[in-house]
């Protein structure tokens, strides 16, 4: 549903028969932690079945999502209140919407986070893939997550077979590093 600048999955969407099946999930060994990611996991119509099966195998499950499908996320969380949800917000509003290629994406993701907090969900937080375009938003976004009492997780821009993208690179490494330093200083206050 998104057109993220660091992931071309939308240009080459997988076919349903190429996605991991419930039968395959049943064969997985026991795990301590499982992260369900995408593309966008909430596009799957069998996500509840996947979560149900994974809870037989995993102590902790977190779903990484862009938070766009608020009603689906809330519905799943009502059935599985112990699940973790990490909503990818790639910066403040304009930056997030440009990187994610989703008009109103920031408001949808932020609104979903607020809704989950209002529901009493405990394991919720922000996720941010840091790159040149959004590094200046690191500290402001951290402050928002901190005010909401939520985890703030970061990853550095990288390439992956699953992204259908091999050209991701941080061009201004000193600027990005300085913004990470600013975040560390904020955390140490």
Describe every region a protein language model picked out.
Residues 2-83, 161, 172-179, 183:
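Conserved alpha-helical substructure of the radical SAM core
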